[in-house]
């Protein structure tokens, strides 16, 4: 069967389920797929984690090295987030330099970490104005079955939680745990008409192009927000999505207690 016909069949099936107020996998509209967080999966990294979100899989590795601070923050360490989306993870990804999708993914994850002040960057100063710790957070998509963003955000914070600052390697004292003080969690919803689907799968993404990602910190404060697509949200739907995102984030944050 030609690929385009198969896509149309799947799309029609998703839409028919939505008309019956159902999702194709039986989940509630505000329900995530099964989440599994596995820490310390990359032996040579300072910190790492693998997240499985349904059939979506993302691994994040953290590396650290001394470097110069940004001129406007001489008393703070530096976090740099990168994302790599390779064809192995999805036929829609192309080889080559980072495209706009990987850049946007890295930017949204970075914003959640930065705006929540998840890492105490003031404790990553070696010599103020001269040398600080640079934290490289590298996101690698292994399998994209929808909602790479939330899986990446979970994997990033999980990897940071088990990161050790490699001070001994650089003759800068003893190693110590990266000072993580918050757990930002992002929740992405697909908007289809007057309905929303939390944690959309790849098949569900075929019926709409408008998503809203809301990132909250451990105190339920919104620290980042990202909307894609052209659908205009009314105030009632936005308020509902905000409440749902906060509640989902609370549940996801409980997963960190299991690692």
Swiss-Prot record:
* Intracellular or extracellular location(s): Cytoplasm
Name the keywords, alphabetized: Cytoplasm, Exosome
Q: Which Pfam families match?
A: RNase_PH, RNase_PH_C
Q: Which residues form the signal peptide?
A: none
Query: SUPFAM superfamilies recorded for this chain?
Result: Ribonuclease PH domain 2-like (SSF55666), Ribosomal protein S5 domain 2-like (SSF54211)
Q: Name one GO cellular component term.
A: cytoplasmic exosome (RNase complex)
**Keyword match Electron transport:** no
| Biological processes, Gene Ontology terms | rRNA catabolic process
**One GO MF term:** mRNA 3'-UTR AU-rich region binding
Q: Which InterPro entries match?
A: ExoRNase_PH_dom1, ExoRNase_PH_dom2, ExoRNase_PH_dom2_sf, Exosome_comp_Rrp42_subfam, PNPase/RNase_PH_dom_sf, Ribosomal_Su5_D2-typ_SF, Rrp42_archaea
KW Cytoplasm (keyword) present: yes
Q: Which domain of life is it from?
A: Archaea
User: Which family is annotated?
Assistant: Belongs to the RNase PH family. Rrp42 subfamily.
Q: How does it assemble?
A: Component of the archaeal exosome complex. Forms a hexameric ring-like arrangement composed of 3 Rrp41-Rrp42 heterodimers. The hexameric ring associates with a trimer of Rrp4 and/or Csl4 subunits.
* Known role: Non-catalytic component of the exosome, which is a complex involved in RNA degradation. Contributes to the structuring of the Rrp41 active site.
Identify this protein by name: Exosome complex component Rrp42
What is the organism field in this record? Answer: Archaeoglobus fulgidus (strain ATCC 49558 / DSM 4304 / JCM 9628 / NBRC 100126 / VC-16)
